[in-house]
Amino acid sequence: MTNVVVVGSQWGDEGKGKIVDWLSERADIVVRYQGGHNAGHTLVIDGTSYKLSLLPSGVVRPGKMAVIGNGVVVDPHALIAEIGRLEAQGVTVTPDNLRIADNATLILSLHRELDAMREDAASNSGTKIGTTRRGIGPAYEDKVGRRAIRVMDLADLDSLAGKVDRILTHHNALRRGLGVAEVSHQTIMDELTSIADRVLPFRDTVWLFLDKERRKGSRILFEGAQGSLLDIDHGTYPFVTSSNTVAGQAAAGSGMGPGSLGYILGITKAYTTRVGEGPFPTELKDAIGEFLGEKGHEFGVVTGRKRRCGWFDAALVRQSIATNGITGIALTKLDVLDGLEELKICVGYMLDGEQIDHLPASQGAQARVEPVYITLEGWKESTVGARSWADLPAQAIKYVRQVEELIGAPVALLSTSPERDDTILVTDPFED
């Protein structure tokens, strides 16, 4: 038995929700360890759809413990609203099935406002990142700047006032520079005191809780958000998120040591998508790109934004295999490729006349690379709902085997529809 870390191996939207839900049935505890409410997913359980963006997937399954780790930035209003939506669907959320790290950073209204103001200003100059405007980046900035308000601060109103003064010294200076009104001390104090009683019951010393559970032999599933190519260090900077999204963050963002992580499962879409700005070497701006987007329902859960679509990029996924230490992948949305006469896979790039096998870190170089493709025969038969290799067309199996060879990692799970049971299990990550 081992613990499992789930990471996206591309730019997010790889289908982590279904796989995490499938794995969470086998887990005792599901832990979010980075990001905020900027990446959503939909779970379908017994015909009911649950849309989650901040809460770990385990919260909707009876008998499971959901944990929000210290690496997550928590918008308390988004948290309360999401709990309310789940309760309206009959899901009970209490400290018996949700814990939040007392040292997790809070997202405040001033973070959301700053995020939006920066994006608006950048839009006018053509340099926008394409954030969700939910305050994620500014909250992480305050965390690193040692001025953040954390969950535990809600329990100590005597010291909270001084911490609010500290954060406002920084933010009001920025607001003056941007030509907008300053935020008053009382506004932030009222904002925090109004939600304290709703958030504090979930507060816990999460690293200690998880350590005790690990020693008891509990199965722990670490649920990543976004994808490895959006990592603040290893992604396509500056078109990235504001946290580390690679598997190593599961240790830092939960308070558990790296030796506790176990199997690293990389969720990998059978083609490539990206939402927002940034380089995308295999992007298809033609009828095939439209086909993938429409058949794959490629619209963001949180923002509703249309995703850009392209061919599978083995060079990029190979990088993610390395930066995450991925043990095996879950290949998703194979069924979206049904009906295409031929398929292409990117195996490397041409950069200034030279072939390279990885995407360079330089923003300028990323903009100049041209993909190098191999072409495979497609298949006409349907793969929808396949639950064994015998159900797959020969060419689909060949495609999967080619992906394995090019990325240097085996397929542990193969998903053939949004339904959780339409999954071919090759290796159970918890039993590895």
Curated annotation (Swiss-Prot):
Entry EC number(s): 6.3.4.4
Residues the entry annotates as binding IMP: 13-16, 38-41, 132, 146, 226, 241, 305
CDD domains the record matches: AdSS (cd03108)
Subunit and interaction comment: Homodimer.
Location(s), subcellular: Cytoplasm
Annotated residues for binding of Mg(2+): 13, 40
Family under the similarity heading: Belongs to the adenylosuccinate synthetase family.
Catalytic activity of the protein: IMP + L-aspartate + GTP = N(6)-(1,2-dicarboxyethyl)-AMP + GDP + phosphate + 2 H(+)
Cofactor note: Binds 1 Mg(2+) ion per subunit.
Stated name of the protein: Adenylosuccinate synthetase
Residue numbers binding GTP: 12-18, 40-42, 307, 333-335, 415-417
